[in-house]
């Protein structure tokens, strides 16, 4: 679920009752007002007057509230107009003018003021020219090299802004699985080394490989006292266990303990006895829905000792279900009828579909993208740079498409049997049309259709755009179905079943965009898609050769829904892929 980080650094909330309205409080109001006015392009003289007033108040040796009105307005940098604003704040705790600007500014834009290296002028460019309204979107834009296309943003600035955003997000309480995984692994390794005779295992949401992790959990036979000594010595803060958490409900009599790392990450330890270790591990590795269904189906005894989770499932007369599949009741229902099919692995991915080169907003040349594919053992590469409406991403106009296709032809001749397929990530326009005429679209081997603009729309509008694009015979793959950016931007509302059904009817594959900030389509809809006969395509949306590594995160998400290689387009071999494209075009008469 999308969860916007709170606004930090500014007290921009309504007045809620008695508080100390001191010089610093008033100065913060004026400082924020000055910056917001700057962002909105107001007269620089007016904006500067509020920043000067803020500076004056911060340095004032006495409380402004204790000064007579005449003396207050005589202070250099205050004056009559500012004096009236100070009186308003002293009386109400608020400033109406500031509230007006706050109401006219997206919360995420205000939040950007907390990012080191971003001032009002740059934020105005980000908001008004790049049409970015959250720091998560901005981080994604940094990763796609989009800032480089705008005045005042060089490569170094882009790197610094990206690093500052990552630091900020790390302290907001929720983390992408991809970002917290290395940290969790390091802590786990240290535990194994320090307590080599004890049993410990990561559990909870992390073990189920959910895309967003609020805190890390372990099941362990380490005693609470030993855990406390280990972590407090390392500079962690001991905090009270959360009695409402699911882990607390399933914890054994040995109890639980929680710590906060210097980075602000919460670690929870569920202490258990050796004979109930695997029972506790199992319980804490299930969603509430799955565990309830398991209890109803098996009537198992959680206090009975088991030497492994596999043994626990065997005792319940069930095939083993790995932790990442323990989400939905339907998984257990199907497992009671027949063994689960082997899930897709990263080794099953035979190609890179959906990648960007220097022709649009990628970091590498076509040759470099192809060479990296060959080095990693992939059989082919689908280059899908941005289309002409994507001015923010240096989208390709018709003449540059012809230039790119000529280079692809030359590379294919030189790199055979490796193949670069000609593609485009075509913007889905406001009316659902694709970005080029049929004559141009026919020059591509395949077309990925995606929404990139005007994301704030009703479900009716979103469905119209998507369905029109799906009905276009040239659309081969529907890209990032909802446009979401995890922890940054919710997706536009869609009727998933209708979209999936339309894709099946029109022989359009549905992308599982593997970028850790997207993972879109959501894995929770893949099971329905597979039941309807849909073809999924795990694609990295790579903007550099390093971006190929995102494939793994798409695979982790797909495994949660039981996707198999035969139902994933990027698992098709080179010749199978060629045949698929040819047969699809023939069926569409294009």
Language model regions located:
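Short, positively charged and aromatic/hydrophobic N-terminal segments
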Residues: 14-15
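Accessory alpha-helical DNA-binding modules that contact the DNA backbone or grooves
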Residues: 34, 46-216, 220-257, 264, ...
């Amino acid at each position: 679920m999308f969860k916007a980080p709170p606004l930090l650094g500014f007290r921009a909330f309504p007045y809620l009752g008695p508080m100390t309205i001191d010089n610093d409080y008033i100065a913060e109001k004026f400082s924020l007002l000055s910056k917001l006015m700057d962002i909105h392009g107001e007269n620089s003289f007016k904006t500067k007057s509020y920043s000067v007033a803020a500076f004056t108040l911060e340095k004032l040796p006495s409380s402004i509230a204790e000064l007579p009105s005449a003396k207050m307005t005589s202070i250099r940098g205050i004056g009559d107009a500012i004096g009236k604003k100070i009186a308003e704040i002293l009386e109400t705790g608020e400033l109406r003018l500031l509230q007006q600007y706050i109401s006219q500014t997206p919360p995420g834009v205000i939040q950007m003021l907390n990012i080191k290296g971003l001032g009002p002028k740059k934020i105005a460019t980000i908001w008004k020219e790049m049409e970015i309204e959250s720091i998560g979107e901005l981080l994604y834009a940094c990763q796609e090299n989009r800032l480089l296309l705008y005045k005042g943003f060089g490569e170094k600035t882009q790197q610094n802004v990206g690093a500052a955003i990552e630091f900020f997000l790390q302290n907001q309480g929720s983390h992408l699985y991809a970002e917290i995984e290395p940290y969790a692994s390091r802590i786990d390794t240290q535990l194994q080394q320090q307590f080599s005779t004890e049993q410990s295992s990561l559990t909870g949401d992390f073990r189920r490989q959910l895309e967003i992790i609020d805190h890390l959990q372990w099941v362990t036979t380490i005693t609470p006292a030993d855990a406390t000594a280990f972590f407090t010595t390392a500079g962690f803060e001991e905090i009270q266990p959360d009695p409402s958490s699911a882990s607390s409900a399933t914890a054994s009599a040995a109890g639980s303990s929680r710590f906060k790392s210097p980075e602000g990450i919460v670690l929870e330890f569920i202490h258990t006895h050796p004979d109930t270790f695997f029972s506790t591990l199992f319980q804490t590795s299930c969603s509430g829905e799955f565990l309830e269904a398991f209890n109803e189906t098996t009537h198992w005894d959680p206090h009975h000792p088991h030497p492994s989770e596999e043994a626990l499932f065997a005792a319940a007369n069930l095939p083993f279900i790995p932790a990442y599949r323990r989400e939905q009741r339907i998984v257990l229902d199907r497992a009671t009828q027949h063994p689960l099919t082997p899930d897709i692995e990263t080794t099953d991915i035979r190609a890179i579909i959906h990648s960007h080169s220097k022709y649009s907003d990628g970091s590498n040349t076509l040759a470099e993208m192809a060479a990296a594919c060959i080095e990693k053992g992939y059989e082919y590469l689908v280059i899908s740079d941005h289309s002409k409406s994507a001015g923010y991403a240096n989208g390709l106009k018709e003449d540059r498409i012809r230039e790119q296709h000529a280079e692809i032809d030359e590379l294919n001749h030189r790199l055979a049997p490796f193949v670069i397929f000609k593609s485009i990530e075509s913007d889905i326009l406001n009316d659902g049309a694709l970005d080029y005429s049929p004559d141009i679209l026919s020059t591509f081997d395949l077309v990925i259709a995606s929404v990139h603009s005007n994301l704030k729309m009703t479900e009716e509008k979103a469905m119209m755009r998507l369905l029109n694009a799906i009905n276009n015979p040239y659309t081969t793959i529907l890209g990032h179905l909802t446009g979401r950016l995890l922890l940054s931007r919710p997706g536009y509302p869609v009727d998933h079943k209708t979209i999936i059904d339309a894709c099946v009817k029109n022989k359009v594959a549905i992308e599982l965009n593997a970028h850790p900030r997207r993972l879109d389509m959501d894995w929770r809809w893949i099971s329905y898609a597979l039941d309807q006969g849909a073809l999924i395509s795990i694609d990295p949306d790579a903007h550099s050769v390093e971006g190929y590594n995102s494939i793994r995160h798409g695979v982790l998400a797909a495994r949660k829904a039981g996707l198999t290689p035969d139902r994933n387009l990027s698992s098709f071999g080179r010749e199978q892929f060629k045949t698929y494209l040819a047969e699809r075009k023939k069926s569409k008469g294009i």
